[in-house]
Amino acid sequence: MQWEVVIGLETHTQLTTQTKIFSGSPTQFGAEPNTQTSPVDLALPGALPVMNRGAVERAIQFGLAIGATIAPHSVFARKNYFYPDLPKGYQISQMDLPIVQGGRVSFALEVDGKTEIRSVQLTRAHLEEDAGKSLHEDYQGMTGIDLNRAGTPLLEIVTEPDMRSAAEAVAYAKALHTLVTWLGICDGNMQEGSFRCDANVSVRPVGQKEYGTRCEIKNLNSFRFLEDAINYEVRRQIELIEDGGRVVQATRLYDPDKKETREMRSKEDAHDYRYFPDPDLPPLVVSAEWIARVQAAMPELPGAMRERFVRDYALSEYDAAVLTQSKGMANYFEAVVAAAGKEQAKPAANWLMGDVASTLNREDIEIAAAPVAAAQLALLLQRIADGTISNKIAKEVFGAMWEAKSDSAKLADELIESKGLKQISDSGALEKIVDDVLAANAKSVEEFRAGKEQAINALMGQAMKASKGKANPAQLTELLKKKLTA
């Protein structure tokens, strides 16, 4: 039997407000336990919540970015459940009337070597408060409770069950991560829990309309864990059904060491939480004027920039999608092109996706911390274009520029000069190199003249070696062919 996978994601994004959603306590990560709390966060009697305007505006920004409906009237509700790090005994969330309704997120997905642009329909995005944390280490066999995180503003983003593979779910999650960090509404730090996903996974026979029984995998805080957890859960469910069993609705956790999911508890439905409107908070009213003010301050969005890169710089869909995965990288690219000229757009894209990206990954830093400024890279590209250096030598110069950590605008020129790396384009000098190589490699010359055309590659390699990589490759190839066919 063939199976279809059905996936929906719920993503918890911590909003970048300086204070909590219903109190004035700070939201700084990493403070000593229970030093960032207030009577509201601790649920002390008589303490009343007050809505954080900044959290609302970040939700509005997100809704506008995905083409959603911003509800003019939304309501906060109490989600009732017991957990040690939930001091009130309920979480303030939104149920029937969320602030963001509908919308779509588009993303690029590699399918059979081709890039497809797909989109996922969102059900909603709602505001809520985060819970505290249970600490299980260093407490002499007991569990400690840290309420610093309690009350941190969250925007929970819920999709329709539109995704059909783990790869598609990861591509969507990455696009969502790009969007919320691009907007500046979330810092996207997955290690600190600022962006974490719950995956709802089910399987059904191909062609069946009814959904299978779903299981929810909680708190996946890396894209690799998300993909591995979904793939394992899909295999588990299919094997269970094919062996005559049935999938039981449950909440599961992913164990990255064993690379498997395990049951945490039976899966709750909405009625288990006994939602009801919070009597301490009035309905949230968002006026058209408020929405217009937020929209006026919105940056260019990744999708619009991706389309502009394809249109204005003649980049491929793939190149444009990669460059717009990060606002910092996209802005750096445009700064390079502005300095080097529009004709350098494709070389700039290649360098950013190649040498620059690999160096950033190796040093585990963002483009904002790169020691090579956009204008410095632009000059390097110009020196390749005008024949001063070859692409191979440019890589050496780039490495030296990175290590130099200099703010000199002429850094590329200075290094080329000081290291003697200028490309040899003088015809007399090149001719001498070619003559010496031909004289020393009579066998390769004979093979070429006998019809083995690839023999020229060996001669080319010897000539480049003799010039220490500085010979102009195009001129060298032309000169070699001329002398070999003379």
Curated annotation (Swiss-Prot):
SUPFAM superfamilies tied to this protein: GatB/YqeY motif (SSF89095), Glutamine synthetase/guanido kinase (SSF55931)
Gene3D superfamilies per the UniProt record, alphabetical: 1.10.10.410, GatB domain, N-terminal subdomain (1.10.150.380)
Record-linked Pfam families: GatB_N, GatB_Yqey
Record-annotated membrane-spanning stretches: none
Subunit (UniProt): Heterotrimer of A, B and C subunits.
HAMAP family xrefs: GatB
Family: Belongs to the GatB/GatE family. GatB subfamily.
Entry protein name: Aspartyl/glutamyl-tRNA(Asn/Gln) amidotransferase subunit B
Originating species: Janthinobacterium sp. (strain Marseille)
